[in-house]
Design a protein with these regions (language model features):
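A structural signal for isolated positions on well-ordered beta-strands in alpha/beta enzyme cores
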Residues: 119, 270-273
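Conserved glycine(s) of the Walker
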Residues: 127
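Short, flexible boundary segments at extreme N-termini or domain junctions of P-loop NTPases and their
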Residues: 2-4, 18, 27-123, 156-171, ...
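Two-metal-ion acidic nuclease core segments, chiefly of the RNase H-like superfamily
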Residues: 300-305
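Switch- and interface-adjacent substructures of P-loop NTPase systems
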Residues: 106, 110-112, 123, 135-269, ...
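Hydrophobic alpha-helical signal peptides and transmembrane signal-/tail-anchor segments
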Residues: 5-13
Length: 367
């Protein structure tokens, strides 16, 4: 009995001391404390008020950087081709030469504006800079990267850059200027504001202006153009969207596009759209770009791009930019040149709409 009592005394003292020692870390299973709900996530392409201008920027998680080596989209299930092209195209050297001549000789119908200024607008990585370089490559006769192109998830272009497309060797520059700016959804510190976009279109933003949401274009901005002429303004806007990302773009991007289109339309500026990366969507088109208008997949992507932009597909043209190629391809050149010709048609409408009205000399009717 003495031994049993001793053991009982020992264990009671030991566990009693242990309980006292661990009391601050003990858990009770009563009612769980009330917790504040997590803050609602901001939309990926939010339009936020920043000291009066609206910021169009992305709040997408940085985890995308870890996945940058993954393909953005895999080929859909192959579908039977259409029997005929749903847009008429001629894939010949003669057609390429004809389009190049048309573009090279183009001059705005209004004498005040000597060049047609086209602004490219689209999400980061949509192919704006690549399109500029691809078009210039066609006229250079070899693949060149005139507009610097990046591959990161943030916008490589940080400032307003205007590229006058040069004609073929020995020819004068064309009457076309393609303007490149930071992509939509460029991040917290490089976001593009609606205020700045409209300032560029109205002709107030100086060439080389570096965009920052906390330093919007104002009259105090260095180089600010107080009274822009027609030559300083944008005459057409071309939205650029990546076909391989249409199904993964944030839903709020459509709202952003529609807001932009409303404000741009209020300025009487015509708008078109370029659908890039078509070769990543359709294996047949990747092999042979002449199949683009026979592809049901591309036709479906065109419709989806129209829904995203709130735009009829008649304004949208598919293109394949030069990226890894070292040599030009005549069929790809024709597709690119048709896109430029499409842009110029709507650009010229702007000049026609804004041409000065000449009423002619007054006639004395002797009344």
């Amino acid at each position: 009995m003495l031994g049993v009592g001793f053991v009982f005394f020992f264990f009671s003292r030991f566990f009693g001391g242990l309980q006292t020692t661990l009391r601050p870390f003990s858990f009770s299973f009563g009612l769980a404390p009330l917790e504040c709900p997590p803050p609602a996530a901001k939309p990926a392409f939010a339009i936020e008020d920043v000291k009066s201008p609206f910021t169009l920027r992305s709040n997408v998680s940085s985890t995308k950087k870890k996945e940058k080596n993954k393909p953005s989209y895999t080929f859909p299930v192959p579908q039977p081709k259409l029997e005929s092209q749903w847009r008429e195209m001629e894939w010949t050297e003669e057609q390429k030469a004809s389009l190049m001549k048309t573009i090279s000789s183009y001059r705005p119908s209004c004498h005040e504006g000597t060049q047609a200024r086209v602004l490219l607008l689209g999400p980061v990585g949509s192919g704006k800079s690549s399109f500029i370089s691809s078009v210039q490559s066609v006229f250079n006769g070899r693949v060149t990267n005139r507009a610097m192109v990046g591959t990161s998830s943030t916008s490589f272009t940080k400032k307003l850059q205007s590229f006058n497309i040069h004609g073929q060797k020995g020819e004068d520059p064309t009457g076309l200027v393609l303007c490149d700016i930071v992509g939509l959804g460029g991040g917290e510190m490089t976001g593009l504001t609606l205020h700045d976009i409209l300032s560029v279109i109205k002709g107030h933003a100086p060439e080389g202006h570096k965009f920052s949401p906390d330093q919007p274009v104002r009259s105090e901005t260095v180089g600010y153009i107080k009274k822009p002429g027609l030559k300083d303004k944008i005459h057409c806007v071309a939205f650029v969207v990546d076909a391989s990302k249409i199904l993964t773009y944030p839903k709020d991007l459509s709202t952003t596009f529609r807001l932009l289109r409303k404000h741009i339309s209020d300025l009487d500026i015509h708008q078109v759209a370029l659908l890039t990366q078509i070769d990543q969507m359709c294996p047949e088109t990747a092999k042979d770009v002449t199949q683009v208008y026979k592809s049901r997949i591309i036709q479906d992507m065109m419709n989806k791009a129209g829904d995203l932009l709130g735009m009829s597909t008649s304004y949208i043209v598919p293109v394949k930019n030069y990226s890894s190629e070292l040599d030009l391809n005549v069929n790809n050149d024709v597709l690119l040149l048709r896109a430029v010709d499409h842009i110029l048609q709507y650009t010229d409408l702007h000049f026609q709409d804004n041409a000065p009205q000449h009423t002619g000399p007054k006639i004395d009717l002797g009344i």
